Amino acid sequence: MAISAPAACSSSSRILCSYSSPSPSLCPAISTSGKLKTLTLSSSFLPSYSLTTTSASQSTRRSFTVRAARGKFERKKPHVNIGTIGHVDHGKTTLTAALTMALASIGSSVAKKYDEIDAAPEERARGITINTATVEYETENRHYAHVDCPGHADYVKNMITGAAQMDGAILVVSGADGPMPQTKEHILLAKQVGVPDMVVFLNKEDQVDDAELLELVELEVRELLSSYEFNGDDIPIISGSALLAVETLTENPKVKRGDNKWVDKIYELMDAVDDYIPIPQRQTELPFLLAVEDVFSITGRGTVATGRVERGTVKVGETVDLVGLRETRSYTVTGVEMFQKILDEALAGDNVGLLLRGIQKADIQRGMVLAKPGSITPHTKFEAIIYVLKKEEGGRHSPFFAGYRPQFYMRTTDVTGKVTKIMNDKDEESKMVMPGDRVKIVVELIVPVACEQGMRFAIREGGKTVGAGVIGTILE
């Protein structure tokens, strides 16, 4: 799904490059020129020009020369993925509409009506169908992709599968009602899946007559956030009315900052998001990792491992660790190729073949990973949060119990694992898991796999997906 920043960029950029359309209407889909470097050698780009040993910066210039000269790729803003979370009917979708309409009034967004966002298209991630609506908009400093899910189950599935990764969230709480059960569940889920920061919007301020009541709700929200180990004391909380902002902007789409109290609250919220939610570290800056998809031998040259670079960069001559399934070993990269073209280095997002010195084809297999030495280790036991599909979603028809042994699909590997323990949100042991449940489990794999905290996986049984999860804690 094209919401996580690298994917969002690459798919949009790919359209532009392969068709070379002069239409300016396509250009806003590019997230940030600062990230184009990551995409330069992405698989769809290469056939469009011959590339032998160009550096990343040269090829960026070459592939985008014409457009840059016409000012189409001048977007220098960093890209951030955010989403609205919170209890049903507290105003998440109305707020999303208000954000797009307010920023459209200053030319930084395309206004979306409530029903355009609410009729969310279906997406699939790890074999699970999820309804998510994505809108994009800009502030003065940043470009945002914003995800909104219509149903509570869609939030749970989206956050666990990572279909729409969030770099931060806007927690929407009704000022008239205060925090409700799903408010708590979404905060907990955000913590468990690693959403680093959030900003709060106290909605429906117009329905609260007493200012003290609003202060009490704010206090309650701060305490709740602190109880889930967010920085409750410092998180910005902005109160307002998304509905009144939408009504004002519907009557007059050209309302400017300072013209209307409720529209100003929306700008104030985005100022807080700009200031408080940090720009995430991009994939190229992280330690190198490639999950091996295929292996073949080139007579006289050695063994080639192919796959997509998940993060970081790798250059010819560098040493990499081969991790997972067997004992970890180190090898030297003697060549980097993509589509029969030789490269100096591979970047995050590239589909490449790495030529390795001193390794036989039999020593490497699909499911292993090549990584920067020491950056990732193999493990056999971890604790994870999982969502189990309902029967209607194509999942199991019956519950499962401790001792259940499905297949766990992680990156390019599938390995059998045993569910040794089942727990609820309070870490109390449970006896069984029903289809549709979200629970914490402890898994023991039959062979060590390169895994890490925050890594997502699918659970499969008999050829079909029965659940998805994210690793919370590595145990051994």
Swiss-Prot record:
<dbReference type="GO" id="GO:0048366">
    <property type="term" value="P:leaf development"/>
</dbReference>
<dbReference type="InterPro" id="IPR027417">
    <property type="entry name" value="P-loop_NTPase"/>
</dbReference>
<dbReference type="InterPro" id="IPR041709">
    <property type="entry name" value="EF-Tu_GTP-bd"/>
</dbReference>
<keyword id="KW-0547">Nucleotide-binding</keyword>
<keyword id="KW-0809">Transit peptide</keyword>
<dbReference type="InterPro" id="IPR004541">
    <property type="entry name" value="Transl_elong_EFTu/EF1A_bac/org"/>
</dbReference>
<dbReference type="GO" id="GO:0009536">
    <property type="term" value="C:plastid"/>
</dbReference>
<dbReference type="GO" id="GO:0048046">
    <property type="term" value="C:apoplast"/>
</dbReference>
<feature type="binding site">
    <location>
        <begin position="86"/>
        <end position="93"/>
    </location>
    <ligand>
        <name>GTP</name>
    </ligand>
</feature>
<keyword id="KW-0251">Elongation factor</keyword>
<keyword id="KW-0934">Plastid</keyword>
<dbReference type="InterPro" id="IPR004161">
    <property type="entry name" value="EFTu-like_2"/>
</dbReference>
<feature type="binding site">
    <location>
        <begin position="148"/>
        <end position="152"/>
    </location>
    <ligand>
        <name>GTP</name>
    </ligand>
</feature>
<dbReference type="GO" id="GO:0005730">
    <property type="term" value="C:nucleolus"/>
</dbReference>
<feature type="transit peptide" description="Chloroplast">
    <location>
        <begin position="1"/>
        <end position="67"/>
    </location>
</feature>
<feature type="region of interest" description="G5">
    <location>
        <begin position="241"/>
        <end position="243"/>
    </location>
</feature>
<dbReference type="Pfam" id="PF00009">
    <property type="entry name" value="GTP_EFTU"/>
</dbReference>
<dbReference type="InterPro" id="IPR050055">
    <property type="entry name" value="EF-Tu_GTPase"/>
</dbReference>
<dbReference type="GO" id="GO:0005634">
    <property type="term" value="C:nucleus"/>
</dbReference>
<keyword id="KW-0597">Phosphoprotein</keyword>
<feature type="binding site">
    <location>
        <begin position="203"/>
        <end position="206"/>
    </location>
    <ligand>
        <name>GTP</name>
    </ligand>
</feature>
<keyword id="KW-0342">GTP-binding</keyword>
<dbReference type="GO" id="GO:0009658">
    <property type="term" value="P:chloroplast organization"/>
</dbReference>
<feature type="domain" description="tr-type G">
    <location>
        <begin position="77"/>
        <end position="281"/>
    </location>
</feature>
<comment type="similarity">
    <text>Belongs to the TRAFAC class translation factor GTPase superfamily. Classic translation factor GTPase family. EF-Tu/EF-1A subfamily.</text>
</comment>
<dbReference type="InterPro" id="IPR005225">
    <property type="entry name" value="Small_GTP-bd"/>
</dbReference>
<dbReference type="GO" id="GO:0003924">
    <property type="term" value="F:GTPase activity"/>
</dbReference>
<feature type="region of interest" description="G4">
    <location>
        <begin position="203"/>
        <end position="206"/>
    </location>
</feature>
<protein>
    <recommendedName>
        <fullName>Elongation factor Tu, chloroplastic</fullName>
    </recommendedName>
</protein>
<feature type="modified residue" description="Phosphothreonine">
    <location>
        <position position="94"/>
    </location>
</feature>
<comment type="subunit">
    <text>Interacts with PI5K2. Interacts with APD2.</text>
</comment>
<dbReference type="GO" id="GO:0009534">
    <property type="term" value="C:chloroplast thylakoid"/>
</dbReference>
<feature type="region of interest" description="G2">
    <location>
        <begin position="127"/>
        <end position="131"/>
    </location>
</feature>
<comment type="function">
    <text>This protein promotes the GTP-dependent binding of aminoacyl-tRNA to the A-site of ribosomes during protein biosynthesis.</text>
</comment>
<feature type="region of interest" description="G1">
    <location>
        <begin position="86"/>
        <end position="93"/>
    </location>
</feature>
<dbReference type="Pfam" id="PF03143">
    <property type="entry name" value="GTP_EFTU_D3"/>
</dbReference>
<dbReference type="InterPro" id="IPR004160">
    <property type="entry name" value="Transl_elong_EFTu/EF1A_C"/>
</dbReference>
<dbReference type="InterPro" id="IPR033720">
    <property type="entry name" value="EFTU_2"/>
</dbReference>
<dbReference type="GO" id="GO:0005525">
    <property type="term" value="F:GTP binding"/>
</dbReference>
<dbReference type="InterPro" id="IPR009001">
    <property type="entry name" value="Transl_elong_EF1A/Init_IF2_C"/>
</dbReference>
<dbReference type="GO" id="GO:0009941">
    <property type="term" value="C:chloroplast envelope"/>
</dbReference>
<dbReference type="GO" id="GO:0009535">
    <property type="term" value="C:chloroplast thylakoid membrane"/>
</dbReference>
